[in-house]
């Protein structure tokens, strides 16, 4: 892991990470300190009982399920805020989905910025590099950026947009120079596809 000295100590914060692979949340829990404890935002509450991958996340005890509908926004916000208010870390895949590339990031959703501003906690950008394709001998790097302060910004439309842009820029910088791995052989492809579904491959992410 690169940039461990940038991780805030003994204080809650929101971790916004790139998301090339379903296994990424487990890497976060493995690489980051036990205190403060880390929780992962997602998956959707309705999916918690379907699919073995979602069940594994549920059994792990690290998930904060959410409801995507606007009518449930208040409940979703309360769940996320409760994690931060208890002094824990909330990790969010800012892209809102799996990415198909490691050296690029799709435009971020505004959820990470909104929650960080509501909780008044800093945002730590994190690039996960090396998990797009799974195969033996693969090197995985977690690259943390400087915390992004939320002071001076309001949790309104303008504040959320500005903070989202700052996070996007920081994550793009962390991915500068990252080259895409060539696809592995049949076994590596099979293992990768076993853990991941990408129905949007005809809509590639934009460069960070």
List each language-model region with its residue ranges.
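Non-catalytic C-terminal accessory region of glycerolipid acyltransferases
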Residues: 74-208
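Catalytic core of membrane glycerolipid acyltransferases/transacylases, capturing the structured
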Residues: 8-70
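Short phosphate-coordinating micro-motif centered on Lys-Gly-acidic
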Residues: 3
């Amino acid at each position: 892991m690169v940039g461990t000295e940038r991780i805030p100590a003994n204080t809650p914060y929101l971790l916004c990470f790139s998301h090339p692979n379903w296994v990424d949340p487990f890497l976060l829990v493995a690489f980051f300190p036990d205190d403060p404890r880390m929780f992962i935002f997602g998956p959707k509450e309705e999916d918690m009982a379907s699919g073995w991958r979602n069940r594994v996340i549920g059994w792990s005890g690290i998930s904060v399920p959410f409801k995507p509908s606007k009518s449930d926004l208040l409940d979703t916000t309360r769940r996320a805020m409760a994690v931060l208010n208890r002094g824990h870390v909330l990790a969010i895949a800012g892209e809102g989905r799996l990415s198909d590339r490691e050296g690029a990031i799709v435009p971020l959703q505004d959820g990470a910025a909104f929650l960080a501003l509501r909780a008044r906690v800093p945002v730590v950008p994190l690039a996960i590099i090396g998990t797009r394709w799974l195969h033996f001998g693969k090197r995985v790097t977690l690259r943390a950026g400087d915390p992004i302060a939320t002071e001076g910004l309001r949790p309104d439309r303008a504040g959320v947009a500005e903070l989202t842009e700052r996070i996007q820029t920081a994550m793009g910088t962390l991915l500068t120079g990252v080259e895409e791995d060539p696809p592995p052989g049949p076994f590596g492809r099979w293992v990768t596809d076993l853990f991941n579904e990408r129905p949007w491959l005809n809509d590639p992410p934009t460069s960070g």
